[in-house]
Design a protein with these regions (language model features):
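Flexible, glycine-/charge-rich segments associated with ATP-binding catalytic modules
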Residues: 1-4, 8, 112-135
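Helix-loop-beta hinge of the Bergerat
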Residues: 2-31
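Conserved short strand/loop->alpha-helix "switch" segment adjacent to the catalytic nucleotide/phosphoryl-transfer site
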Residues: 20-42, 100-102
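Conserved polar catalytic motif of the HATPase_c/GHKL fold
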Residues: 42-47, 113
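Short helix-loop "hinge" at the ATP-lid/N-box region of the Bergerat-fold HATPase_c
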Residues: 48-52
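A conserved short beta-strand within the histidine kinase catalytic ATPase domain
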Residues: 58-66
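Glycine-rich/acidic phosphate-handling loop/turn and adjacent ATP-lid/helix
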Residues: 72-103
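Glycine-rich phosphate-binding loop
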Residues: 100-115
Length: 135
């Protein structure tokens, strides 16, 4: 699995997007799949930037792998920030109006809808969120 390590900062979002885009292009991902993956990658990475390290700077790692036998891309997001399982929270109720709905949860709901698989684990002091999209 190829890995990109970087300071978790908003300024590095484009580096993350380019890293994943390169893998998708090499694997022959369609424009639709590329757009869906880019949205999910942005949402997850921005959440790491904003919430993983409340006391300051921290590092993030993005691992990316494509599989030609079963055409898919697997992307892992790792950080050593505050332990947080975004999948443990109940999905946002999108049938409610914006005023009635509690704040938060729409981004991870969007990721779950766009990706084919989304899993989370906390191992060796790291949050590991894995997304899979079939090509």
């Amino acid at each position: 699995m190829k890995e990109l390590r970087l300071q978790a900062s908003a300024e590095r979002l484009e580096d993350v997007q380019e890293f994943v885009r390169g893998k998708l292009e090499a694997a022959g991902g369609s424009l639709k799949v590329m757009s869906q993956v880019e949205i999910a990658v942005e949402e997850i990475y921005v959440n790491i930037v904003h919430y993983a390290y409340p006391s300051g700077d921290g590092e993030a790692a993005i691992r990316c792998e494509t599989d030609r036998e079963v055409p898919k891309i697997t992307i892992q997001f790792l950080d050593a920030g505050t332990p947080f399982d975004p999948l443990a929270k109940e999905d946002a109720d999108i049938s409610l109006s914006a005023e009635e709905r509690s704040i938060g949860g729409l981004g991870i709901l969007m990721v779950k809808k766009l990706m084919d698989e989304v899993t989370y684990c906390y191992e060796e002091g790291k949050n590991i969120l894995t997304i899979v999209k079939y090509l």
